[in-house]
Amino acid sequence: MSGAGATSRVRATAGVTTAWGRALHAELLKVVTLPAMWWSAAVAGAAAIATMMSVLQNVVDGQGFGFEEIAPTWTLAVQIGFVAAGVAAAGAEHSTAQGMTSLLVTPARGRLAAARLMVLTGTGLVAASVMVGASLAACPTMSAAALWAGGRTVVWLTAVLLLAAGLGAALRSVIGASTAAVVLVILTPQLAVFLGDAARWFPGQAGQIWLTAAESQADVTSAGLIVLVWTTAAQMAGIVRLVRADA
């Protein structure tokens, strides 16, 4: 009996492992084969290159600068691609038959949501790291401050991707999710003059405080937590919609 029980447990563990592997593989395959994701990556990459070229052309001969000095401006352009990628990743699930295919591959919706979150997080970290790393290397000056700024930028861009994807999954509308993400992430910093201190509670302005790190450590940490709360809330809303919806 004990031998049979051990065998059953091994088989159950193997089955769960296989199910997780299948779910992760399916989600990764969707991300890398979705044309909109590649277009979004191209937009982000082009924005990064254009921003760096503009900065380098305007630098006075012999004047050095590090990534920490251009990170906020650089990110304002690059994050547009990450917003588009997040909305596209979620939108493809509902604007096409991809959502039903996902459920056929991974019927357990909780596992599907977790696999999707892990794949998107990994994708965001890799894509952001590549772009930030290339821009860091292009800067004339390298320092610990530049590396810290690069790390904060990677975290922010990944959060933008997850926030947009969460909005897309929750709203199930490409137009609605795009509008909400653009307002929250891109327009809020531009409206900070009119919104005053209230702007700090929106992810876009909080992200700028997080990136510049020019304020007190408490304010920077608070900004990071605000971004985390917004991202978590958007993802949780998307997960709840996935688990409770009919398809």
Q: Where do the model's predicted regions map?
A:
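Solvent-exposed, acidic/flexible segments
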Residues: 21, 92-93
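Interfacial "coupling" helices/loops that link adjacent transmembrane helices in transporter permeases
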Residues: 94-117
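C-terminal and late-domain segments of enzyme folds
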Residues: 204-206
